[in-house]
């Protein structure tokens, strides 16, 4: 199939007591009509409560997945890879160039189109001790596992106006190049 996508949930098989929470793989030939690739989740380790990303990486020639998990009580990001979108490596936590313990939600990680040897991400930093503020930050990597994080937000709460509070300042996945 030309298109693949994630769906988060649990198995709906009648009477299934071993149902696991996780990411389900879908496929579509046309991008309009979708079907499950298998009836059980393909990734079950993680929290899956924010933007779960999967994309084909033409440099590594495999699919990459980035999703959320709890790392010693702190919200963080995991990565795993697959050759077929069904069989994934064991997810591992991202590693950072600093020792900051920051809650990270959505990750918006992708290859940077103008320098494809780089990964770029805009994770949402959650600050529960500061009125549950959220702000996107910048991070980059050469291998998709080891990331450099910048401390300053990419978009502060003051720009544009009225972006204060929980769940009010996120960046979505993708970059748009302007002429």
What kind of region is each of these model predictions?
Residues 1-179:
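Carbohydrate-active catalytic/glycan-binding domains of CAZyme proteins
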């Amino acid at each position: 199939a030309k298109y693949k996508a994630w769906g988060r949930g649990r198995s709906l098989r009648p009477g299934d007591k071993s149902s696991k929470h996780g990411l389900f793989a879908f496929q579509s030939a046309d991008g309009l009509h979708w079907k499950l690739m298998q009836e059980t989740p393909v990734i079950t380790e993680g929290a899956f409560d924010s933007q779960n990303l999967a994309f084909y990486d033409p440099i590594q020639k495999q699919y990459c997945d980035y999703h959320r998990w709890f790392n010693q009580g702190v919200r963080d990001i995991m990565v795993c890879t697959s050759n077929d979108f069904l069989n994934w490596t064991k997810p591992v936590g991202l590693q950072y160039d600093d020792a900051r313990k920051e809650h990270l939600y959505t990750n918006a990680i992708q290859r940077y189109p103008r320098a494809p040897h780089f990964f770029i991400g805009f994770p949402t930093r959650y600050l529960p001790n500061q009125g549950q503020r959220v702000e996107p930050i910048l991070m980059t990597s050469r291998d998709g596992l080891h990331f450099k994080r910048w401390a300053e937000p990419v978009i502060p709460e003051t720009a544009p106006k009225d972006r204060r509070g929980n769940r009010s300042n996120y960046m979505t996945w993708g970059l748009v190049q302007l002429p």
